[in-house]
Design a protein with these regions (language model features):
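Acceptor/aglycone-binding surface of glycosyltransferases and processive sugar-polymer synthases
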Residues: 2-12, 17, 29-112, 138-147, ...
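Acidic metal-phosphate-binding loop of nucleotide-sugar-dependent transferases
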Residues: 25-27
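Catalytic donor-sugar/metal-binding loop of nucleotide-sugar-dependent glycosyltransferases
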Residues: 84, 110, 119-135
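DNA-recognition element of transcription regulators
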Residues: 116
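C-terminal catalytic/acceptor-binding lobe
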Residues: 126-166
Length: 166
């Protein structure tokens, strides 16, 4: 899954900063450069710059069904996790490698909930985040549907339990 693939990439990284963007081409890749520039100009306590569909300057075009699923998931995350973020799931993120190195050995999630686990564990280690606007243009059929949305909610529920116990 996504989480497994990103973790493998993180393990092989030797640069000062590391990032990823979803491969479905919905997000403009220029967002990576913007995130990197903002992260470079911030203090070391800022562990990552993450894309946010709900940022006031974001330009987001995608179907109502995806908006509904995204809204439900965001509300679920707000209730279950104590993260001061408006959007954890947009697939554009850049991090300081030193921040990733602190949490990488503890990451367990292999699916879509990986982003949330990563952000929670970074926050627990004292890192802050910058949310950045994104340009999102839904072009292709996604693998996300009602079934995967329900699976994501269930996985996220179990992640909340796991993080509370550990």
């Amino acid at each position: 899954g996504k989480g497994f693939a990103v973790r493998i990439g993180f393990e092989d990284c030797t640069t000062e900063f590391i990032g990823f963007i979803d491969a479905d081409l919905d997000l403009h890749p220029e967002g990576l450069a913007i995130a990197l520039d903002l992260l470079k100009s911030s203090g070391p306590q800022v562990g990552g710059a993450i894309g946010s569909k709900v940022h006031p300057k974001s330009n987001v075009e995608y179907p109502l069904s995806r908006r509904v699923l995204s809204s439900v998931y965001k509300k679920f995350v707000k209730i279950g996790f104590s993260l001061d973020l408006n959007d954890t799931q947009t697939g554009l993120k850049v991090f300081r490698s030193e921040a990733i190195d602190k949490v990488l050995p503890t990451l367990k999630c292999n699916g879509f909930e990986f982003d949330l686990e990563l952000l929670c564990k970074l926050a627990r280690n004292g890192f802050l985040f910058i949310e950045i606007p994104v340009d999102l243009d839904y072009k292709f059929k996604s693998t996300v549907n009602i079934r995967t949305g329900i699976k994501a909610l269930v996985s996220t529920f179990w992640l909340a339990i796991y993080l509370r116990r550990n």
